[in-house]
């Protein structure tokens, strides 16, 4: 490919609405263009990067025994109604009607469609297990699409679905996909970590997320410094506290005026106590009914843990009007004593101490000496808070570190969440009808490209790992009008092609500085400069985009010298 024949519309400035590095650089490098909110055109170089990523995903899926198919993006409502997700999924599901008034949606995922397919095709245990996948455009009507390809409404995804006859088979399929994902991200040259995760709206018994490590990541990972434990903070367990056999006696409750002190910080400063001496009482609404959750004043409620404990579909903070109704006080003064809420839950850390300061369910008033066992009606104590670096690993007790990551893959063991309501069954050896056990496995292919850039960039542009780069190498011909120089550049180009290198020849009539800046911006891993002065000295200048290290390759014996240098550059990426 010649640069002069390729459409690479690079820009000097990023668009004003681009917030994150990947959005800025993908746009500046001419790889994407925005069509409308959350929807992008993949330009030639952007599409090449996506296709290279998809090719590696496809190879590893095939190696793991999965079979590729293609399902429609448009899905009938009746399947979603049958699974129970038509109402549950909410406004992210884009719904519409055809001319006959029939309801449809644009698929954000394909559990219903694949289960419907398999239940109509697979009858016997002899046909199991089976694992089917596709790489397809999806649509999710995000309320706030942002960050370019990181959180768009339309995106490219690989989704796979396994069907097994029993739990043991489902576990085998799950871990086969887990290993395939490990292979994918290693081959892509990314620094990543697999972490325990919450299953969210997909459901299922357990799941793992694959996180690309990046300081700009939206997710926080809690990882043990002593063992292999790692989890998304939504999922990360906090070990139960050491509870004394007996706690010191607590005196009578005492009302304390706290005029105008609504926040934990304000109350504790006013009373001259640490935030750990206070219990926060949070009023929430779970599937339309009020509930209360108690955590220590210096802790943060983990609403995902509470939602899983309640097994509810919707959970949100109560509106101020409801808080006033159930507590008799404005926001900021709720407490567990005399609270007019039927279900009250407390973080298990509160078992380790007593004699708390709480809200009094009365304006401008708090309580001292509150004993939860004595003074409050707690339905259950459980792990309800967000883990912190001060907490110990729940597995081995060693310190926890928090890092940032970007979710690019997710594997779920679904169990019978979809196969049971959709009646996806088979006949076993004894002729008995049984429900298939499922798993589902997703990789955000377009998101992988964006997250790669979030992890690998510098002040000059993108730093692509060789497997993802639109072109692994660029040959910059400094004087394409000089027939001898261009001829030599074309010889080197042919040699690189013969070695299987995806290379572009920059034959534009531009200043060398422009060519160098574009090569860095687009992120070409292997950069070669062919110029008259270098040829006169018998060398070609080579630069490793990742390190910036320059070396000289001899014109005589160029092929072997390049092969050796390329291997060294790839080794630097762990490839």
From Swiss-Prot:
InterPro entries: aa-tRNA-synt_IIb (IPR002314), aa-tRNA-synth_II (IPR006195), aa-tRNA-synth_II/BPL/LPL (IPR045864), Anticodon-bd (IPR004154), Anticodon-bd_dom_sf (IPR036621), Pro-tRNA-ligase_IIa (IPR002316), Pro-tRNA-synth_IIa_bac-type (IPR004500), Pro-tRNA-Synthase_IIa_type1 (IPR023717). It comes from the Bacteria. GO terms for molecular function: aminoacyl-tRNA deacylase activity; ATP binding; proline-tRNA ligase activity. It is found in: Cytoplasm. Keywords: Aminoacyl-tRNA synthetase, ATP-binding, Cytoplasm, Ligase, Nucleotide-binding, Protein biosynthesis. Its EC number is 6.1.1.15. It catalyses: tRNA(Pro) + L-proline + ATP = L-prolyl-tRNA(Pro) + AMP + diphosphate. It is an enzyme of class 6 (ligase). Gene3D superfamilies: Anticodon-binding domain (3.40.50.800), Bira Bifunctional Protein, Domain 2 (3.30.930.10), YbaK/aminoacyl-tRNA synthetase-associated domain (3.90.960.10). GO terms for cellular component: cytosol. One of its GO terms (biological process) is prolyl-tRNA aminoacylation. Catalyzes the attachment of proline to tRNA(Pro) in a two-step reaction: proline is first activated by ATP to form Pro-AMP and then transferred to the acceptor end of tRNA(Pro). As ProRS can inadvertently accommodate and process non-cognate amino acids such as alanine and cysteine, to avoid such errors it has two additional distinct editing activities against alanine. One activity is designated as 'pretransfer' editing and involves the tRNA(Pro)-independent hydrolysis of activated Ala-AMP. Consists of three domains: the N-terminal catalytic domain, the editing domain and the C-terminal anticodon-binding domain. Homodimer. Belongs to the class-II aminoacyl-tRNA synthetase family. ProS type 1 subfamily. This is Proline--tRNA ligase. It comes from Nitratidesulfovibrio vulgaris (strain DSM 19637 / Miyazaki F) (Desulfovibrio vulgaris).
């Amino acid at each position: 490919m010649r640069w002069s024949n390729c459409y690479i519309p690079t820009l000097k400035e990023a668009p004003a609405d681009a917030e994150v590095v990947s959005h800025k650089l993908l746009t500046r490098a001419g790889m994407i263009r925005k069509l409308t909110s959350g929807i992008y055109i993949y330009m030639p170089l952007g599409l090449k990067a996506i296709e290279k990523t998809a090719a590696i995903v496809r190879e590893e899926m095939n190696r793991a025994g999965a079979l590729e198919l293609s399902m429609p993006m448009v899905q009938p409502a009746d399947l979603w109604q049958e699974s129970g997700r038509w109402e549950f999924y909410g406004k992210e599901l884009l719904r519409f009607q055809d001319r006959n008034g029939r309801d449809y949606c644009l698929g954000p995922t394909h559990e219903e469609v694949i289960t419907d397919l398999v239940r109509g095709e697979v009858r016997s245990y002899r046909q199991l297990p089976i694992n089917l996948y596709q790489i397809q455009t999806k649509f999710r009507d995000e309320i706030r699409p942002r960050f370019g390809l990181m959180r768009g409404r339309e995106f490219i995804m690989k989704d796979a679905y396994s069907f097994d006859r029993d739990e043991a088979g489902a576990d085998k399929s799950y871990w086969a996909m887990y290993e395939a994902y490990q292979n994918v991200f290693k081959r892509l040259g990314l620094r990543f970590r697999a972490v325990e995760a919450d299953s969210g709206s997909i459901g299922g018994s357990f799941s793992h997320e694959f996180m690309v490590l990046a300081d700009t990541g939206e997710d926080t990972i809690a990882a043990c410094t002593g063992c292999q434990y790692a989890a998304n903070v939504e999922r990360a367990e906090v070990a139960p506290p050491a509870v004394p056999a007996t706690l010191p006696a607590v005196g009578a409750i005492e009302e304390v005026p706290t005029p105008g002190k609504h926040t934990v910080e304000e109350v504790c400063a006013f009373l001259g106590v640490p935030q750990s001496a206070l219990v926060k009482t949070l009023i929430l609404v779970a599937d339309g009914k009020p509930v209360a959750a108690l955590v220590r004043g210096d802790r943060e409620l983990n609403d995902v843990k509470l939602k899983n404990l309640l097994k509810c579909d919707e959970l949100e903070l109560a509106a101020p009007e409801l808080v006033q109704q159930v507590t008799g006080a404005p926001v900021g003064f709720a407490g567990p004593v005399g609270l007019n809420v039927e279900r009250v839950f407390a973080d298990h850390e509160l078992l380790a101490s007593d004699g708390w300061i709480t809200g009094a369910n009365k304006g401008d008033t708090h309580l001292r000496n509150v004993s939860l066992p004595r003074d409050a009606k707690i339905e259950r104590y459980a792990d309800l808070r967000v883990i912190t670096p001060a907490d110990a690993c729940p597995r081995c007790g060693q310190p926890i570190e928090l890092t940032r990551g970007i979710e690019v893959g997710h594997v779920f063991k679904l169990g019978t969440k979809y196969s049971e309501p959709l009646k996806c069954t088979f006949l076993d050896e004894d002729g008995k009808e049984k429900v298939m056990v499922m798993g589902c496995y997703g990789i955000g292919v377009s998101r992988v490209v964006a997250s790669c850039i979030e992890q690998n960039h510098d002040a000059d542009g993108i730093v692509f790992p060789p497997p993802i780069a639109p072109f692994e190498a660029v040959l910059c011909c400094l004087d394409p009008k000089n027939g001898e120089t261009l001829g030599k550049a074309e010889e080197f180009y042919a040699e690189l092609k013969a070695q299987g290198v995806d290379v572009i020849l920059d034959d534009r009539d531009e200043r060398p500085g422009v060519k160098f800046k574009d090569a860095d911006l687009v992120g070409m891993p292997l950069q070669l400069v062919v110029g008259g002065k270098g040829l006169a000295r018998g060398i070609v200048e080579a630069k490793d985009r990742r390190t910036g290290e320059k070396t000289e390759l001899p014109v005589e014996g160029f092929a072997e010298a390049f092969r050796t240098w390329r291997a060294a550059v790839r080794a630097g990426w762990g490839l």
